[in-house]
Amino acid sequence: MNTSDRIKSTQIALDRDLREQALLLLKEVRAVDGVDAFSEQFVRGLAEPGLGHSHLIVTLNDKLVGLAATDEETTELAVHPAHRRQGIGKALIDAAPTSSIWAHGNTAGAQALASTLRMKKTRELLVMEISDRALDGSAAYKDPDGITHSSLANAPVEKSVAEAKWLQSNNEAFDWHPEQGGWTTHRLAQAQKADWYKDSDVLFLWDGEEIVGFHWVKQHSPELQEIYVVGLSSAYRGRGLGDPLVRLGLHHMRAHGARKVILYVEADNTPAVAAYEKLGFTVAESHVVYEK
């Protein structure tokens, strides 16, 4: 039987046993590749039917050896390390309903497969990191003149008002972004359901009762934390407030025990990459979208 004939379509979020196999597969891939094959949203899609993700699976002797997950726009996939170079990755890509395929870590194997299939790289997302002494130096923070700061937990306005202003600031900052832009109240509420989310980790700079910008922190562990999203409202761009906004989050994370901080940034966002490098961040990983 050809590999393509063994592909089955399913929704793993509705099948507990299959979900456990999928999580085990992702763990085994991570152990070999040193990088997660699925992003956070696609991992959530394995357990949350409401996200509407569909899945393609390949099994061998009742063991899950290949998996592709798809939302409306992109596909992510994982192939068990012991079953690579057997046509599974190619078959999953051929069967995927989207043309955009993520290659997290852009491993040598992913690059070789993309080359074989004549796929083109259309997007690159960098993971940058800072740690130890460099982090200590960049975590110094002082409110700019006329500006105050808070978290969502102690905002100077009602929480619902702060959330509405946060949403507006986000959509102004990311009107160009395929995942972070165009958020709705429902989309924000869904994001706040993540098990790691805390109101105290959503930080704001304020000009009176207007949000200058926000810095959303994700704590993977006390030692490893992330600049999850950071953005400036339109009215406050070009005023030198991006640097203190980033430092506010670094100060918060360092105060909560962080020894390493990571972030994701588009590789072609040259000003942002340069600003993070100036703070002491270096590139740790590259994640690529290939088009078939």
Curated annotation (Swiss-Prot):
Residues of the N-acetyltransferase domain: 13-168, 159-292
A Pfam family per the record: Acetyltransf_7
InterPro entries per UniProt: Acyl_CoA_acyltransferase, GNAT_dom, MshD_Acetyltransferase, Mycothiol_AcTrfase
Enzyme Commission numbers on file: 2.3.1.189
Secretion signal, residue range per the UniProt entry: none
Residues that coordinate or bind 1D-myo-inositol 2-(L-cysteinylamino)-2-deoxy-alpha-D-glucopyranoside: 40, 179, 218, 226, 264
PROSITE patterns: GNAT
SUPFAM superfamilies: Acyl-CoA N-acyltransferases (Nat) (SSF55729)
NCBIfam families found in the cross-reference section: mycothiol_MshD (TIGR03448)
Role played: Catalyzes the transfer of acetyl from acetyl-CoA to desacetylmycothiol (Cys-GlcN-Ins) to form mycothiol.
Annotated family: Belongs to the acetyltransferase family. MshD subfamily.
Protein name (record): Mycothiol acetyltransferase
